[in-house]
Structures are given as C-alpha cells and as structure tokens.
C-alpha cells in the first residue's frame, strides 16, 4: 500500500529484498525514501478458491492455488484449465490463447496437437526493452551444468544511439548454448530498442533447433539491431571485455 509517492510505504504481507539468491523477509515494516518512479509489480493469484473448483473435485496446489497439468486436463477428465491458472506455465496472454485454440481443436475438431510450453518468447516493455526466449543462464546451469555450457555475450550500440559519447553498456545480448558442437542454442536474451521485434524472429529459430554454428554463419542485415546476434563472438569463459569501442556500433 503506497502511503505517498515521495514519502513512506507499508508492506502489509511479505516482500523479499536482497542482492543475493537468499531472500530476506520484510513484513509489516515501513520504509521511507524519495523516488522518481514507483513500479507496482504485484503479480496475480489464481481464483480457484473463489470459483470453488474443489466442489467439482479439481485438485489444486496448496501453495499457489494453481492447477498442475501438462495438457490442460485436470484430475477430473471433463474439466480443463488454460492460462495463468496452470502451475509453472508462462503467464502470458498469447500462451493462453494458443493453448485454448489447440484444446478446442482437440475436443471438437479431431486435433492432436498439444500446446508446447517450452521456448515461449516474451518481452518486458520497459523504455529500454528486454526480450528473451528459452533458458536463462542460471536455469541452463541447473539443467546442464556450467562446464557443459558456452555463454556468448556482448554490449552493443544501436544505430539509434547516434551520440558517440553515449554509454555503450546500455544495451546487451546473451546467447546460452551447449558447449559441444554444433552448440545448440538454449536461450537468447536481448536488452535494447525493439527487443520484442528482434526476439520474435529468433523464437521460431530456437524452436527449430537453432545452433550457434548456424547463427554465426548467418549474414546479418546492416544496420539493424537483430544482426548483433550474428556478430557476437566473445564468451564469458574467455574473460574478454564484451564492450564495443566507442567509435563502433
């Protein structure tokens, strides 16, 4: 609950604030400071309790009241769920739309195609956008092990940043790959102008099994933002500085 934009705010429930993965709980405490911008990212919760799905025998996960299903079918054969109410599925409108269409096709049109919840692209539409598809570096390390990964990354200067002195570390990209050839791409991350437009195209490539060998052999369209993915060569393992020269874009 915001008491004042430039004053104090009260955290009525629970909030984690920590620079490391170990969260620190703050409950019912007051923090005071002055802010230029206040972002309320409170998320959502499933309304399965309000809709009384338990009366139909549908089981939900106690911790978040969501339904666990890989094919939208609940534990009750004739009850289905799509969208944000599903446990550990992307909370995105296009995901719910696609899953609903495929479910309707299976129920009424003899369709067989299941919703693919892997490698769903998404973008955070902040003033400098962040777009991604596939695994994060942390999740890839958890699944594959750090020694089995190669992380390519680079800062870059968009053509839109025509002022030479502008900070070259505002825009960044990362490609998470398997280390063994042909280095299958597991995730792509992009911070910069029009990130959503850039990632949308690469999302299809990732779903088709894009490899880094294919990526680096692709001729980029110059000058575009998307071509930066075809130019990245520096790995985190190398320890080299991924910052471009001040004269380069």
Label every PLM stretch briefly.
Residues 9, 59, 147-150:
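Conserved beta-strand segments of alpha/beta enzyme cores
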Residues 1, 5-7, 135-139:
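N-terminal glycine-rich dinucleotide-binding loop that anchors FAD/FMN and/or NAD(P) in oxidoreductases
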Residues 113-129:
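Flexible, acidic loop-helix segments that line cofactor/substrate-binding pockets
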Residues 18-19, 76, 167-170:
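A short, glycine/Asx- and small/polar-enriched loop/turn
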Residues 125-136, 141-249:
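Flexible, glycine-rich terminal cap/loop adjacent to redox cofactors
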Residues 33-109, 201:
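FAD-site-proximal beta/loop scaffold in flavoenzymes
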Residues 94-117, 146-148, 206-212:
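Internal hydrophobic alpha-helix adjacent to the cofactor/substrate pocket in enzyme cavities
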Residues 3, 7-32, 38:
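Conserved beta-strand-loop-beta-strand element in the redox core of flavoprotein oxidoreductases
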